[in-house]
Amino acid sequence: MATQNYKVADISLAAFGRKELEIAENEMPGLIAVREKYAKSQPLKGARIAGCLHMTIQTAVLIETLVALGAEVTWSSCNIYSTQDHAAAAIAATGVPVFAWKGETEEEYLWCIEQQLKSFPSGKPLNMILDDGGDLTALVHERHPELLVDIRGISEETTTGVHNLYKMFKENKLKVPAINVNDSVTKSKFDNLFGCKESLVDGIKRATDVMIAGKVAVVAGFGDVGKGCSTSLRSQGARVIVTEVDPINALQAAMDGFEVTTMEEAVKEGQIFVTTTGCRDIIRGEHFNEMKEDSIVCNIGHFDVEIDVAWLKANAKDVVNIKPQVDRYELKNGRHIILLADGRLVNLGCATGHPSFVMSCSFTNQVLAQIALWTDNTSYPLGVHMLPKKLDEEVARLHLGKLGVKLTTLTSVQSDYLGIPVDGPYKADHYRY
């Protein structure tokens, strides 16, 4: 009998996951178009991709796209709460080694990543990394440096992971070429902005059933994620206060009509708090002590360092688990704090993450990055690179038909006047969308 080469919560959920996966495919035109374009040429043949990214239904479509293009794939989730167990089961049932389930411990999380390094069907180790947050990249560099010699490249999904890549490269610790997928326009301006715009409120409402209209919401950070969250909360009728360290982002927030102040001032008024910064220690003990009764506190940044959950656990008189990922802490001053997803990603811990369509944009970039690194590694020396503007525009183009968009075509006269090709790229690399 063959050895079981996966660990998921319940493999019997595979049929349920497959049904949702089929619905998601219809909402992910970019990935399906890439399959159709490259299925015959098999550009990822020989690639052994270890992926560490939220094991959701949308990620399942990404995994099956990589396999359709010739890759061997193993998978773990980049967050202990973000796995959708029916999605993990659906992929494991196809023979892809998946090590992920919702509610892993920290030890189990690292175990899952370790397992995927040596679980490829061919018996050979990984030679490509597809990462979200940088944990897989860091683990291979720190614990398994002997594997780095055969790894052709890394593609990184999120802001936090990209920050770590640039830091590693600056400190001469990065040993493999990497592509920054996060800062592709069709990722950052869509996934980070429009995705958070829908999934943040979904997570808060599923967790608490709270009425957002009329509340005061505090959003820490006004980058693309913060912009999406602030706009979303305002659209629900909340009065939104923004905190920022960057004067440019602060000015943007103010001119968008948001009040901008410090967290020390905002805690006196806020009832819903959302951290979006990618930085640590944004909401600390002194802030909790000033919050109103039953303030809702959550994070939508990648790691769980933005909210000082350790202080909350150490200093609370009592804690009651209301339901999965919803805990009510009683402080020594008698007031209560409602913490969502233990300070981790609220949209994935308390809901199902971003909608399929916007994830198709992000994941199409991931596939193109993997193809570029695998087939053309001479164009990507050691460092952190961006995908060419032409590919960024192609990702957008693949999603227009689904929305019924009709694109205008430049005339030859207009093309000459602007000095750009009729078929693009249409903007310089330094253009800010």
Curated annotation (Swiss-Prot):
What are the entry keywords?
A: Hydrolase, NAD, One-carbon metabolism
Instruction: Provide the catalytic activity annotation.
Output: S-adenosyl-L-homocysteine + H2O = L-homocysteine + adenosine
UniProt keyword Metal-binding, yes or no? no
Q: Which GO terms describe its cellular component?
A: cytosol
Top-level taxonomic group: Eukaryota
Q: Name one Pfam family in it.
A: AdoHcyase_NAD
* MF annotations from Gene Ontology: adenosylhomocysteinase activity
EC number(s) per entry: 3.13.2.1
Which BP terms does GO give this entry?
methionine metabolic process; one-carbon metabolic process; S-adenosylmethionine cycle; selenocysteine metabolic process
Pathway(s) of this molecule: Amino-acid biosynthesis; L-homocysteine biosynthesis; L-homocysteine from S-adenosyl-L-homocysteine: step 1/1
Binding of NAD(+), residues:
158-160, 192, 221-226, 244, 300-302, 347
Q: Identify which cofactors the protein needs according to its UniProt entry.
A: NAD(+)
Cofactor: how and how many bound: Binds 1 NAD(+) per subunit.
PROSITE patterns, per the entry: ADOHCYASE_1, ADOHCYASE_2
InterPro entries this protein is in?
Adenosylhomocyst_ase-like_sf, Adenosylhomocysteinase-like, Ado_hCys_hydrolase_NAD-bd, NAD(P)-bd_dom_sf, S-Ado-L-homoCys_hydrolase_CS
- Where does the chain bind substrate? 56, 132, 157, 187, 191
Recorded family membership: Belongs to the adenosylhomocysteinase family.
What's the protein here called? Adenosylhomocysteinase
